[in-house]
Every structure is written in structure tokens, then in C-alpha cells.
């Protein structure tokens, strides 16, 4: 299990800062896919009408986890950057710290 604190002191690339400052940490989440992207428009046009499924649907999934991406926002200048972590099954943001002799809880 990976437990990350909600704030982190790290280097800020913003023009005002360019030094180590406090950053607010959140987990990156993919945005909603646009209906007007060229690939989606082409796919919808091809799918319309008779003839069933026209493109292959991918089934051979190989990975069991995704890489965790952190979104760091500078508290002073509000510049945002992303930081990729390694793959993990359990990810927690701002959870309780581990204590010695305690059982793991999911």
C-alpha cells in the first residue's frame, strides 16, 4: 500500500517561485472524452447505419494496475505539475501513518 501526504515541499518551476515551496497534492483523473475529437467523429460515422460493429474491441488486457499520477499545485503561484509514481494495487492520499506492530487494513 502506498500512502502519500496531502502536502509536499518540492521545487516549483513557476516564474515567480523557481525554488522549493509547499505543494498541494491530488490524484490525477482523466477528463471526459470529447464527442468532437476527430477519431470519435470518424468512429461514430462508421458505426451508424446497418452492419454491426465495424472496428475491433480490444480484449487482451495485459496490465493489472495503472501508474499513479500525482497533480502538484504550488500554494504560492498556483502552477500545476504532474508526477508519475510506480505501479501499485492500493493507493491512499493523506491516510494515517503506519505504526509499529499494527495489522494492515485495506
UniProtKB/Swiss-Prot annotation:
Extract the signal peptide range: none
Could you tell me which PROSITE patterns the record lists for this protein?
RIBOSOMAL_L44E
The keyword Ribosomal protein appears for this protein:
yes
Q: May I have one GO cellular component term?
A: cytosolic large ribosomal subunit
Q: Which GO terms describe its biological process?
A: translation
The family note in this entry says: Belongs to the eukaryotic ribosomal protein eL42 family.
Please give the name of this protein: Large ribosomal subunit protein eL42
Which gene holds the coding sequence for this protein? RPL44
